[in-house]
UniProtKB/Swiss-Prot annotation:
Belongs to the FAD-dependent oxidoreductase 2 family. FRD/SDH subfamily. Its EC number is 1.3.5.1. Part of an enzyme complex containing three subunits: a flavoprotein (frdA), an iron-sulfur protein (frdB), and diheme cytochrome b (frdC). GO terms for biological process: anaerobic respiration; electron transport chain. Its main location: membrane. It catalyses: a quinone + succinate = fumarate + a quinol. It is a peripheral membrane protein. The lineage of its organism: Bacteria, Pseudomonadati, Campylobacterota, Epsilonproteobacteria, Campylobacterales. The gene is frdA. Binds 1 FAD covalently per subunit. The active site is at 257, 273. It is an enzyme of class 1 (oxidoreductase). This is Fumarate reductase flavoprotein subunit. Changing residue 301 to E: No growth on fumarate, loss of FAD cofactor, no enzyme activity.
Length: 656
């Protein structure tokens, strides 16, 4: 039995995992990062548009602060987020930006003087004063009051990932790629590491640790049409589910991005629209102002995606050999702007669509993009299975609720890596491994036997056909628009596919370097994740954020102001067990209300929301009359916790 020991085990080599590894290594803890691929190829590198942080540096971000970022995030979540976690996030994001700058991220900087921008499809001159020169710049993104998204042209995730990975290397973090965690080792409700398969040799290795953190990204690849990389299959989430103890939160909350390139599915950043790009239909008409006259193309992603599909349903889609699509027009920005700030977008359009976006419109169609759901954790990032932590897209830390704002993803990845990383390091420093050898042997031998049984199986089912059918079922029935009959059909067929996945036969009988074997053990896990999504969507009879039920079109704050918790306590069951965690209105800093999109009466109000809003107004007016500043008012409305090193107030231009 091969065993490796460490203080801190991080599963996943993207931004969240690597930043958490920095936190533990800085505390003198021996840290191992496991990754399916070389870490600098992680999906974090695909993030283009930027990272939200309320610096308030540029002219168009004047007056920005944590309060505005917090309000945008809560409204964007459709009041589904944990507001205390959202506060932790917005307070730490400016610190993260500056830390990354110190580590070498070449943030795009402000140039003093006049510059031309496209706002609402009109050329506008913005004048940046001399005192702003050289400060970190920001661009506009959907669902925000200020231009808050800091960026490095349109390669933000790439530069951030390289900087954090290099910091790990500098600190001596042990990074091991081509390693896949296939089960968590746990005893008496505590996690002590993972059983890992070497993807090259096929060896099964036990990694024993004082604490384990999962940061394996989202589960987009359960869908056919997705912007996610091929490694984003949700198996990191699934191994937590398979413990029978850890729970998954809000798995039905799946975001569809408005502007993936059609039909390839490669993302064209929200920065295209933030910089002034517009959406057009088959007639060349700019249609978003018809639906959302205030925010237009920069409404929240769930809203824009729905409006696009509605418009196609009205017969305004562009016909193509691959299906219908709409147009993204960034030609109005001019070639210089595109070649300076949207270079990756230009290359993607040229390589994968054969067009120059400075001259022609790009074909786009909403596709699956982000997973708001994940391993449910507390504010410290710890799951119900003690000693198991999670961060980034793999987690339901729950600062996104039922819809994520653009730019809050890579921001959360780094900020969660910082905050959760501190709590994770504290846990690892104060924990001893109390694991019996026979328990360790049981987990390792169990996985060795499972791999052997898969290659020796006489099963008749084709794992590739099962996987492809799962993707079709999810696309057809659990997409942007949902309803009871389609969701019932999805749950029924996914359950049948899950049963079939237990009877697969594979032709390649090797235990090493065998992609067919990998599919054989991954697909049942992916189907469990897909069932959590579909069953959660079926049972949630309301529309909230990215979860849109055409048969229940209103947000229901009386019955559904809660968080879905999915678990799989019995390995023999074929459907997840669902329960719900109430969101306490009386602890919210912003009471549930009108989100700002569509009809004002399109939600069922909870009477507690009215009462809470009255309390908020009373506290605020009394403290303002007493001369208290916004920080004191915020503390009175909703206290929250942060690691000591991140509690300091953020400084901005014009602060007194």
């Amino acid at each position: 039995m091969k065993v490796q020991y460490c203080d801190s085990l991080v599963i996943g080599g993207g931004l969240a995992g690597l930043r958490a590894a920095v936190a533990t290594q800085q505390k003198g803890l021996s840290t191992i990062v496991l990754s399916l691929i070389p870490v600098k190829r992680s999906h974090s590198a695909a993030a283009q548009g930027g990272m939200q942080a309320s610096l308030g540096n540029s002219k168009m971000s004047d007056g920005d602060n944590e309060d505005l970022h917090f309000m945008d995030t809560v409204k964007g979540s459709d009041w589904g987020c944990d507001q205390k976690v959202a506060r932790m996030f917005v307070n730490t994001a400016p610190k993260a930006i500056r830390e990354l700058a110190a580590w070498g991220v070449p943030w795009t900087r402000i140039h003093k003087g006049d510059r031309m921008a496209i706002i609402n499809a009109q050329k506008t001159t913005i004048t940046e004063e001399d005192f702003r020169h050289g400060l970190i710049h920001s661009r506009d993104f959907g669902g925000t009051k200020k231009w808050r998204t800091c960026y490095t042209a349109d390669a933000t995730g790439h530069t951030m990932l390289f900087a954090v990975a290099n910091e790990c290397l500098k600190l001596g973090v042990s990074i091991q790629d081509r390693k896949e965690a296939i089960a968590l080792i746990h005893q008496d409700g505590k996690c002590y590491g993972a059983v890992v398969r070497d993807l090259v040799t096929g060896d099964i290795i036990a990694y024993v640790a004082k604490g384990t953190l999962i940061a394996t990204g989202g589960y987009g690849r359960i869908y056919k049409n997705t912007t996610n990389a091929v490694v984003c299959e949700g198996t990191g989430t699934a191994i937590a589910l398979e413990t029978g103890i850890a729970q998954l939160g809000n798995m039905e909350a799946v975001q569809f991005h408005p502007t993936p390139l059609f039909p390839s599915g490669i993302l064209l950043t929200e920065g295209c629209r933030g910089d002034g790009g517009i959406l057009r239909d088959v007639d060349g008409h700019r249609f978003m102002p018809d639906y959302e006259p205030e925010k237009k193309e920069l409404a929240s992603r769930d809203v824009v995606s729905r409006r696009m599909i509605e418009h196609i349903r009205k017969g305004k889609g562009v016909q193509s050999p691959y299906g219908q699509h709409l147009w993204l027009d960034i030609s109005i920005l001019g070639r210089k702007h595109i070649e300076t700030n949207l270079r990756d977008v230009q290359e993607i359009c040229e390589y994968f669509a054969g067009i120059d976006p400075a001259e022609k419109w790009a074909p786009v169609l909403p596709m699956q993009h982000y997973s708001m759901g994940g391993i449910r954790t507390d504010y410290r990032g710890e799951a119900k299975l003690k000693g198991l932590f999670s961060a980034g897209e793999a987690a339901c830390w729950d600062m996104h609720g039922f819809n994520r704002l653009g730019g809050n993803s890579v921001s959360e990845a780094v900020v969660a890596g910082m905050i959760v990383g501190e709590y994770f390091a504290e846990h690892c420093a104060n924990t001893q491994v109390d694991l019996e050898t026979k328990t360790l042997e049981k987990f390792v031998k169990g996985q060795e036997a499972y791999m052997k049984s898969l290659v020796e199986s006489k099963g008749t089912e084709d794992v590739f056909k099962i996987k492809n059918r799962m993707k079709d079922v999810m696309d057809d029935n659990v997409g942007i628009f949902r309803d009871g009959p389609h969701l019932e059909k999805a749950v029924k067929e996914l359950e049948e596919l899950y049963k079939k996945s237990k009877n697969v036969g594979i032709k390649n009988k090797r235990l090493h370097a065998n992609p067919e074997l990998e599919e054989a053990y991954r697909v049942p896990m992916m189907l469990k994740v897909a069932l959590c999504v579909a069953k959660g969507a079926l049972d949630r009879t309301e529309s909230r954020g990215a979860h849109n039920r055409e048969d229940y079109p209103k947000r229901d704050d009386i019955n559904w102001l809660n968080r879905t918790l999915a678990s799989w306590p019995n390995p023999e069951q074929t459907l997840p067990t669902l329960e719900y965690e109430a969101l306490d209105v009386n602890e919210m800093e912003i009471a549930p209300g009108y989100r700002g999109y569509g009809a004002k009466g399109n939600y069922i109000e909870n009477p507690l929301s009215v009462k809470r809003q009255e309390e908020i107004d009373k506290i605020q007016s009394e403290l303002e009359a007493a001369g208290k500043d916004r920080h004191a008012i915020q503390e009175a409305l909703m206290p929250y916790e942060l690691p000591a090193k991140y509690k300091a107030r953020n400084e901005r231009l014009g602060d007194k």
